[in-house]
Amino acid sequence: QVLYNRLVSFDPVKNTPIPSLATEWHVSEDGKTWTFTLRQGVKFNSNKFFKPTRDFNADDVLFSVLRQMDPQHPYHKVSQGNYEYFHDVGLDKLIKSVKKVDDYHVQFELNEPNAAFLADWGMDFASILSAEYGEAMLKKGTPENVDNWPVGTGPYALQQYKVDSQIRYIANPH
């Protein structure tokens, strides 16, 4: 929760979904099409391997969703990912497709209406990763850095990590 944001977060009193990286969402009358409007001007932090050249956008949402959903995605097996929660809540079977409408709109087509769909995007498994970082690390041959040295939009950035010893964060300067 300190490194990443998600499309929605939860109201601390009512425990209902509220805007986070998505500023609003619209649901079709049949409940099977969800369109999210994304917050503009959101910056990813940087690390010793990567400095972002663009703001958060729809490409990052697609990267984060497809990594979990598509077994052919280049990041699906990185760090031995099995995405248990994504599968346990049934998103792999619920989501028919996800597409970028434009830089700040993402649309999900569902196989059937689902009352929990919105709340699922506030869970930790739904953290939004940088597609640009993923692409850069893939080109360098070090895709595991996306998991080992995370880059997010959350309030903090990873400064140092020592296995079984220390994790040090710094405030995200953005």
Spans of model-derived segments:
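Aromatic- and charge-enriched surface segment that lines or borders ligand/interaction sites
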Residues: T23-Y75, Q107
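Envelope-exposed proteins and targeting segments
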Residues: L3, L21, D30-W34, L38, ...
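Second-shell loop/turn segments in exported
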Residues: V42-P52, L94-K96, V146, A157
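Residue-level signal for nonpolar/aromatic packing positions in well-ordered secondary structure
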Residues: L7, E24-W25, N47, F108, ...
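N-terminal lobe/hinge region of extracytoplasmic solute-binding protein
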Residues: Q1-E29, L66, V151
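Surface-exposed binding/hinge segments that line
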Residues: T37, L62, M69-E135, Q160-K162
